[in-house]
Amino acid sequence: MKLDSFTARRGNPELVAPARATPRETKPLSDLDDHWDLRYLQPSLEFFRVVDGDRRPARPGDGIKAALAEALVYYYPIAGRLRELPTGHMLAVECTAEGVVFVEAEADVALEDFGEPLMPTFHGAEGFLCDVGDTRVIVGRPLFYLQITYLKCGGFVLGTYMCHCIADAFGTIQFLKAIVDIARGEAKPTTLPVWERELFLATSLQPHIKEDQKKLFDELESTTCDDIMVTMPTENMVSEYFILSQIDMAALRRHVPLNLNKTVTSFELLTAVTWRSRTIALGYRPCHIVRLMIVVNARGRWKKLPLGYYGNGLLCSVIETTVNDLCTNPLGHTIELVRKAKDEMKTEENMQLRVDLLPLWREKPYIKVQRIFEACDIKWIGQDTLDIGWAKRIGGGIPTVSPPNLTSYQFLCKNEKGEKSTVISMLLPQPAMDRFKKEMAAWLIE
């Protein structure tokens, strides 16, 4: 059964406030949080199978709702509202304790109807998510939405929207883990939250801009564009997931030269192959400049970031080359390009430079850079730690809902054989998607 073949019967939405009194204050966002490209509600889905036990509530939603209220005591800014400051069109959080949205729903389907083990694609996932309207409207409205959908098998789905200005994917999982920790019976979250958004504020009013970065800024001000990935509305594209088994990964590694085979990571290899395949599929001319944007998690790399930081902590590095250079050289050359982009974020000095550039990006119009491929590794995001005790997580991830995301995510799941596999998301026009599939299939031929 496909996810688009059922109807969820939703109850009335209600606001859930923190379980106890919380500070009333205004909290500014970081320069990274306040980036215009993050001003939207990010969806996610988590599927659970209920297990027997003494702590199992008669109705899972009661336990989740109570845990949500308790978690908001610690994560109280999430219960507030975004306001636009008088100057600079910048946002801040008013900690008003107005609450987040909670909805209960029912659907006459079972976990088994979606295939076992559960894997993407999550087409039609809107049934598991609150009706939030325009996901780009974030000021003056709730910052978090949670819908629990009961399935006829006794399992349930947690569908959430988190305002991306408040938390990135890692921070969102941290908040969800706080909820499930308390629902499991813990007195408080196992990881306590840290706000400290000043850690991602620019420290230089006149940062040094490298030549390649200047070209990006100049392009944002350009009024001409011939890249279909920019000119075509994302709603007219198709989004698909590609699942690569361990056998598939072994087939890809056979294309890697010996001097790189033992050191290349799965992210580097998959990013190199998908970047080349996508570039060919889009039909860019050999002389065109193409770019790769690597999204790097600063957690664990930047010593000043404390455990529990749940704000946006993903920084980007960009490299460029020509289509001819990318697609006619051996795969090892592409892997080296990917590594070059990753290495840009190796030093704390370079990470601070990226932060110092953020205010300049805010002044630019909301235009996507031409012929750029954005890759993000969320394989170790921590979804497998969502242990409620009386319910076991069996799958989940980022669903395909409007507006689609241009970023290509890599994450983990189990395939039909129960083997750990890597999933890649891809958004393309339909003709390009057809060509992309053929290019990927060619790489997987042993």
Curated annotation (Swiss-Prot):
PANTHER family in the record: ACYL TRANSFERASE 4, OS10G0105900 PROTEIN
Active site: H164, D387
Keyword hit for Transcription regulation: no
UniProt keyword annotations, A-Z: Acyltransferase, Transferase
Enzyme class: transferase
GO molecular function, one term: acyltransferase activity, transferring groups other than amino-acyl groups
Statement: the UniProt record of this protein carries the keyword Transferase: yes
Protein name: Spermidine hydroxycinnamoyltransferase 2
The protein's Enzyme Commission number: 2.3.1.-
Organism whose genome encodes this protein: Oryza sativa subsp. japonica
Record family assignment: Belongs to the plant acyltransferase family.
Pfam families named in the record: Transferase
Function: Hydroxycinnamoyl transferase that catalyzes the transfer of an acyl from p-coumaryol-CoA to spermidine, to produce coumaroyl spermidine. Can use feruloyl-CoA as acyl donor. Contributes to the natural variation of spermidine-based phenolamides in rice cultivars.
